[in-house]
Amino acid sequence: MTLQTFKSTDFEVFTVDGLEERMSAIKTNIHPKLEALGEQFAAYLSKQTDENFFYHVAKHARRKVNPPNDTWVAFSTNKRGYKMLPHFQIGLWGTHAFIYFGLIYECPQKVETAHAFLEHINDLKTNIPNDFVWSIDHTKPSVKLHKTLETNDLQKMIERLATVKKAELLVGIHISPEEFSAMTNEQFLAKIESTMQSLLPLYALCNR
């Protein structure tokens, strides 16, 4: 049986008012799909890397007043968490689905990873697909399209990862609700797989 992924109507969960109400809608409608994606792609990443990957569905446990504007499942090699490690994500905002690889501010490997990325910056500029996007803050939906960046722009983002304590850097794709409505489950799963394939060389640079 084909894994049931998101529907275009799932984006509407972020229009539900109130913390408890929105969290209830996320837990009912989104979390089961994130769990299923987590199982499938933790196994996929484990096979691709010969490492044990674990998945972590966002719980939003720290939220006491404001409801979440996005939700996700993350993949790392630590069974207890992902924020301290380079990791992959699949998730939703109200405006798009996303598939990312990156490092957020809690990760202690940021300086070493930034140096590795800088050493291979020309490869990154050339080999990352033009329709991929870069994010410097996982809590905001705004991104920069890879094809619009000069090598110098990319260099500045990577250098910031090394020099700014709260800096983050994620790269991957966005899929709009309109694009999503035209995709089958199989096409979405294939898109996740192809995106992760394009991002695995960056993961390898983090672990050289």
Swiss-Prot record:
InterPro entries (alphabetical): UPF0637 (IPR009403), UPF0637_domain_sf (IPR053707)
Gene3D superfamilies: Protein of unknown function DUF1054
Organism domain of life: Bacteria
Family as reported in the entry's similarity comment: Belongs to the UPF0637 family.
The protein's name: UPF0637 protein BCAH187_A4079
Organism: Bacillus cereus (strain AH187)
